């Protein structure tokens, strides 16, 4: 299934190109956007999710909710969608606490990641994990 993403340069400027992230080989200086969420409840507990066993990368591994931004999606819109899809939670009042780049020309794996932090009122019972994630 195709999933289209926007291409950015190293300064995070949109390059006016949209590509299929599953088939496109990223060239030097081309990046896609990923987002991750640190979700902390009011008791100071953090939510991590376990990846499905059939995932191509890190099957069964533990991770923070997140994923790739879709075409025309801002970083903030992407993290809201990803958290909702993966946990059933609606996030508000978050902010970026860290960003980094990965440029791996050997594997054509170029991306930048925005990591958000959200402190919110939720319990384990509120979390509704997505089976496919």
PLM features per residue range, with description:
Residues 29-31, 61, 108-112:
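A generic structural micro-feature
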Residues 69-133:
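Unchanged
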Residues 34-66:
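A glycine-rich, hydrophobic loop/mini-helix early in the fold
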Residues 11, 52, 116:
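Anionic group-transfer/hydrolysis microenvironments
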Residues 1-36, 42:
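Acidic, metal-coordinating catalytic segment for phosphate/diphosphate chemistry
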Residues 7, 39, 48, 117-120:
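Conserved hydrophobic "DFG−1" position in protein kinase catalytic cores
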